[in-house]
């Protein structure tokens, strides 16, 4: 009986050790290599839609406390093998105060001066190239913006009576060549005029592609924004691929 009990205890001990090893491996991969990420809002439309699933790589910018999954690491200063993002990169970050995960686009690097005038973006005193594009029509799906969304007024029906979203698109090209589409809902939004603000050393200026519906570096922390330029240490990783999209597509970034 004693031998049987001993073997049973050995079996349980091995199982527990195996589980611990697996959990540590998963944590290590999530923290150092890549992890999945779910888009929870419309702030990065039209590039990313509410409900999209992403793969976020952890190594392009080095590692900091924000790289560790599940917010297990205490906030510290410094970054191992740190490399600054490029303008136009889409990054996942921890909010500097709440540690909630956000996803935004890098607009300004350390030393840049950022301003907006009537919705037009200026970097270092020069207007960013922008071009109005034809409206983007997106078929309705379960993640279609609801009445509480700033995009709800663009919900309409096409010729066949199908419910769609018709979005006003402006294509921007940042210094360095990164080109992407943004949503410009017209005048009258508080974030249409901002700055100028100089990005401090060790910080980044981040914005959502849904320019009039994004709580980003232009928006105070009290209004759930980022409250200005964000410390580089708060960046957790770079968005690489949509593993599943609500519109059925998969794209690289």
Question: Where in this protein do the model-derived segments appear?
Answer:
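Soluble "head" domains of membrane/secretory-pathway proteins
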Residues: 2-13, 32-33, 37-38, 43-253
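Hydrophobic membrane-insertion alpha-helices, especially the h-region
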Residues: 14-32
């Amino acid at each position: 009986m004693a031998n049987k009990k001993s073997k049973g205890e050995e079996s349980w001990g091995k199982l527990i050790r195996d589980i611990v090893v697996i959990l540590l491996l998963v944590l290590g991969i999530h923290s150092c290599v890549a992890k999945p990420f779910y888009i929870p809002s419309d702030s990065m439309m039209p590039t990313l839609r509410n409900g999209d699933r992403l793969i976020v790589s952890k190594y392009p910018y080095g590692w900091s406390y924000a790289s560790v999954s599940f917010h297990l690491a205490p906030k510290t200063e410094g970054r191992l093998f740190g490399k600054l993002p490029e303008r136009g990169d889409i990054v996942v970050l921890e909010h500097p105060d709440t540690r909630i995960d956000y996803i935004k686009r890098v607009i300004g690097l350390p030393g840049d001066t950022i301003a907006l005038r009537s919705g037009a973006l200026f970097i270092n005193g020069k207007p960013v190239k922008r071009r109005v594009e034809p409206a983007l029509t997106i078929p309705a799906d379960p993640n279609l913006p609801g009445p509480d969304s700033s995009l709800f007024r663009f919900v309409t029906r096409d010729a066949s009576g199908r419910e769609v979203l018709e979005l006003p698109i402006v294509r921007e090209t940042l210094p360095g060549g990164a080109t992407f589409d943004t949503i410009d809902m017209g005048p009258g939004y508080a974030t249409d005029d901002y700055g100028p603000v100089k990005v401090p050393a060790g910080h980044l200026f981040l914005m959502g592609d849904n320019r009039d519906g994004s709580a980003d570096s232009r928006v105070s922390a009290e209004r759930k924004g980022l409250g200005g330029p964000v410390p580089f240490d708060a960046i957790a990783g770079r968005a690489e691929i949509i593993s599943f999209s609500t519109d059925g597509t998969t794209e690289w970034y």
